[in-house]
From Swiss-Prot:
It comes from Danio rerio. The gene is nalf2. Belongs to the NALF family. The keyword Transmembrane applies. This is NALCN channel auxiliary factor 2. Probable component of the NALCN channel complex, a channel that regulates the resting membrane potential and controls neuronal excitability. InterPro entries: NALCN_aux_factor_1/2. Disulfide bonds: none annotated. It is found in: Membrane.
Length: 401
């Protein structure tokens, strides 16, 4: 009895000692656990708030971009803008279809976009005196200069920066035909039974090449609509990729210079612009690549770039309503290229601001999550330490027995 009572007393003393020892250890852990719960709740609230605000911000940004594209000013007075200074957003590019002009450009550009099929027949009827035309050419004293001035009023449908005069000057053998300027003039004004046949055949050859280029562009446009519906980069948007791809197609089918040009470059350099501006597309998994081997390859481009040989083309991305100032409206500096530098437009600047804002939000979110993880780890370590302190004290009576 005495021994048992003594043991019981020692056990009670041990329990009291345990209470006295563990009390200052458990109390801070309990308080820190409450603090950690509040921190976790706050971190979760901030996380969902950041996601919601970012979603609303992106929606608002998309509406602003569409509003900017809708109200983008076109070239109503091209001569005045050429004198006062040109801006990138004034070029009036239609992102949906690069082969058509805006409604404000139709009237001012109607004469230059006259039907190509009637170009030779109208000139032949004018020679015969059966019809009067606003482009008067004196038949007995016709000169190559007057002949070219007449054909400068006719441009291609897809590669609209090129006129028939540009093609007659530099591309004299389309599809194996003889389309030299001297041969066309002799065919039109020789007085033979087949007057105008050579002119019509050359115009049809140019039209067929233009249609082939448009078909290739439509295939590429379907590809961009499928894989690149949204802008994929701050420095290179989808419409810039489409524009430079169209310029490359026209340079490949019609490697000729233009009369109105601000800057010249080898025609094959457009291929490098497409590689630098457009992303790399994997056709098997609908993903975009920003590194690795490009899917658009330029055969023999490096040799031609170093030697600077080959025909020169006008560095024109797109033109305005008037062909006389269309080259001034050209975006001759594309971002991310190897030889050009372009000012960031308002859309690119807004994309940059949105990207910086998203990065800032992401950094803050990562910091909160990291702080929460460290706090939870500290709480688990505190709980483990308190258990390690309690277990040896409970084993004291067993050791004494």
């Amino acid at each position: 009895m005495i021994t048992g009572a003594w043991r019981c007393g020692r056990k009670l003393d041990a329990e009291l000692e345990i209470c006295r020892v563990t009390e200052p250890i458990d109390k801070p852990c309990a308080e820190s656990e409450k603090v950690q719960r509040w921190r976790m709740s706050l971190a979760s609230l901030l996380f969902f708030t950041a996601l919601l605000s970012d979603h609303l911000w992106l929606c608002a940004g998309g509406k602003l971009r569409s509003r900017d594209r809708t109200h983008r000013r076109t070239w109503n007075n091209a001569s005045h803008d050429a004198q006062t200074g040109l801006r990138d957003e004034d070029c009036g590019v239609l992102l949906s279809n690069l082969t058509e002009n805006g409604p404000d450009c139709v009237e001012a550009d109607a004469r230059r976009r006259a039907p190509l099929e009637s170009a030779c027949s109208t000139l032949y009827r004018q020679k015969s005196g059966s019809v009067s035309s606003s482009y008067s050419v004196t038949v007995p004293t016709v000169s190559p200069h007057a002949f070219l001035e007449y054909f400068r009023n006719f441009s291609l449908s897809f590669c609209d920066a090129l006129t028939i005069a540009d093609l007659l000057e530099s591309m004299t053998s389309p599809d194996g035909l003889n389309c030299s300027l001297t041969h066309i003039i002799r065919d039109l004004f020789s007085g033979g039974p087949e007057d105008g046949d050579a002119c019509s055949a050359c115009v049809h050859a140019y039209t067929r090449l233009d249609q082939h280029a448009q078909e290739k562009y439509e295939e590429f446009d379907a590809l961009t609509r499928k894989y690149m519906a949204d802008d994929y980069s701050v420095r290179a948007q989808t419409h810039l990729c489409q524009v430079v791809y169209k310029a490359w197609l026209c340079a490949e089918y019609f490697p000729v210079p233009q009369r109105q040009c601000v800057r010249w470059l080898p025609c094959r350099h457009y291929c490098g612009e497409v590689t630098a501006t457009c992303p790399f597309i994997l056709p098997d998994n609908d993903r975009l690549l920003y590194a690795g081997s490009p899917s658009f390859l330029c055969a023999g481009f490096q040799e031609e770039y170093l030697s600077s040989q080959g025909p020169d083309c006008c560095d024109v991305r797109w033109s305005g309503c008037d062909s006389a100032v269309g080259a001034a409206c050209a975006l001759t500096h594309l971002p991310g290229s190897f030889s050009f530098h372009r000012r960031l437009s308002s859309g690119a600047m807004s994309c940059t601001n949105r990207l910086h804002g998203s990065k800032l939000k992401l950094c803050v979110l990562v910091l909160f999550l990291l702080h929460t993880f460290i706090s939870i780890t500290t709480l688990q370590h505190c709980s483990t330490g308190s258990l390690e302190a309690i277990v040896p004290l409970e084993e004291v009576p067993m050791r004494e027995e």
